[in-house]
Amino acid sequence: MFYGREEQKKRLFSMIDRDEQMISLIYGRRRIGKSELIKHTLRESKVRSIYYECKQTAEANNVDSLSEIIGEEFDFPKPLFRNMEETLDFLFKKSEEMSLILVLDEYPYLRECIQGLDSILQALIDKYKDTAHMKFIICGSYVDTMKALLAKQNPLYGRIDLTIELKPMDYYESALFYEGFSDEDKVRLYSVFGGVPYYNRLVDSSKSVRENIIELIASPGARLENEVSMYLNSEISKITNANEVFEALAKGFSKFKDILDQSHVSSGPTLVDVLDKLIRMDVVKKEMPINDENNKKKAGYFISDNLSLFYYKYVFRNISRMNIMDVDVFYDKYIAEDFETKHVPKIFEDVCRQYLIRCNKKGLFSEPFEKIGKYYYDDSVNKKNGEFDIVTWDDKGYVFYEAKFRKDAITEPMIEEKIAQVKQTNLDCYKYGFISRSGFVCKESEDRILISLDEIYKE
């Protein structure tokens, strides 16, 4: 079953329907669903297609494999091409007679074994641009390599008609994988497996959240136990530095200086390099407060990939214990309480941010906001700095939001206390929003926005 990605499918079909040659670049981190998106689109399209997954082998082997697919698709004996340029030229020429989709998946593998492949493609694209009906899709997981194809100095510069950087699904699309679970459990599952389709399709609806976590990530030999380290090893040469940074981030250290102090990374410039790489890999994000966006000192770094966060928070540091303990005893001692009282509520804040953005994009707010994020303030009473996690800004001013993932309903005294706390920081809000897992016991008013959990998952 294929879930979500409606926007990306729409863009791909729009490209395929054009009566001219079109070149597309699709990239994103491993396991994010690039190949499945393309295959699903090909299945739904009526246009003839050649899908080839490039291999980490010599050019001759790739030519032989692609030639075999070509022979099968066009129902003639396998053609004997001398090289990849000849093979691709045949397909481009074929597309002068008919619409044809050509997909080169895992393109960086082919690029490694064929010198000057980008230039070869450029020559073919230019040669057939006015006569072919080729829909050429280049796809790959090595983000730096794929982004380099868009650079000004690359031969393909200016020839890509459609670029799709596939990102993790949001909480709503991810929940499509969690059929049969309550809304509360959907938040819990998302807090572990995030928006990566490959992880989410492993969730077993016949088992509890706890059982899924233990079987997939928190037990010796679990299906995803080595997933995080494998991804890092495929992209980063010095894995030790990445592990150090992840451990510091998982403990809650988010400021550059604190990360440097907590980790054993040798220097500031080295830490900058590691963080930049992790950000490009889509596993770490850098956030600036919306009221001080240009102040580098107030930048915060956070693990954005939920599986990586869970792994480094609970598994990585306790892996020796996990390997010799009963899985349920280990879960109860090192995961259960912190997961429910701290981890899930923190991820729930991110879910709420995503929900607000979804509403904003749909035009559901009378005043659409232009900024959303953390708000930095100086607490003069307690002589310390602080942050509010969810604040939006629109033409009328700021709106503050408080997200609570707790068993009890949000009450009137709680709301009044929080509003008083916000006013004490001199944050001038014209509305106050509250988002609750367990509903509300309070009065409504024009300056309040009350959102319950079921609204977040409503169609």
Regions found by a protein language model. Give the residues of each.
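A cross-kingdom feature that marks ATP-driven nucleic-acid transaction machinery
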Residues: 299-459
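Phosphate-binding site recognition
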Residues: 1-333
